[in-house]
Amino acid sequence: MKSFIVLAVTLCLAAFFMGQSVASPAAAAEESKFVDGLHALKTIEPELHGRYKRATCDLLSGTGINHSACAAHCLLRGNRGGYCNGKAVCVCRN
């Protein structure tokens, strides 16, 4: 009885792993679209990242530190400071 259970488990595992080794047609189609190396860098479109100029003044306006955060942002960029204008946009001084 013990050897029968071991044989049954072994056959089940073998069947499971045999089924996993067969590649599906969808995976083969995805691999055909794969581009490798330098050619990939030339063909891949760059990701678009939005620039949110109002993040410093808008997000921190409720805490009361919006002008300080804008000034710190401008100092990190190498300017003499900055302020938040009426449209909640950080304006850096030269």
UniProtKB/Swiss-Prot annotation:
Q: Which SUPFAM superfamilies match?
A: Scorpion toxin-like (SSF57095)
The record's listing under InterPro entries reads: Defensin_insect, Defensin_invertebrate/fungal, Scorpion_toxin-like_sf
Q: Which UniProt keywords apply?
A: Antibiotic, Antimicrobial, Cleavage on pair of basic residues, Defensin, Disulfide bond, Immunity, Innate immunity, Secreted, Signal
Which PROSITE patterns does UniProt cross-reference here? INVERT_DEFENSINS (PS51378)
Keyword check for Signal: yes
The induction annotation reads: By injury to the larval cell wall.
The region annotated as signal peptide is 1-23
**One Pfam family of this chain:** Defensin_2
Please tell me in which tissues this protein is expressed. Answer: Hemocytes and fat body.
Asked if the record carries the keyword Cell inner membrane, the reply is no
- Residues that make up the propeptide removed upon maturation: 24-54
Q: What's in the GO CC field?
A: extracellular space
Disulfide cross-links: C57-C84, C70-C90, C74-C92
Family in the record:
Belongs to the invertebrate defensin family. Type 1 subfamily.
Protein's name in the database: Sapecin
Which species is this record about? Sarcophaga peregrina (Flesh fly)
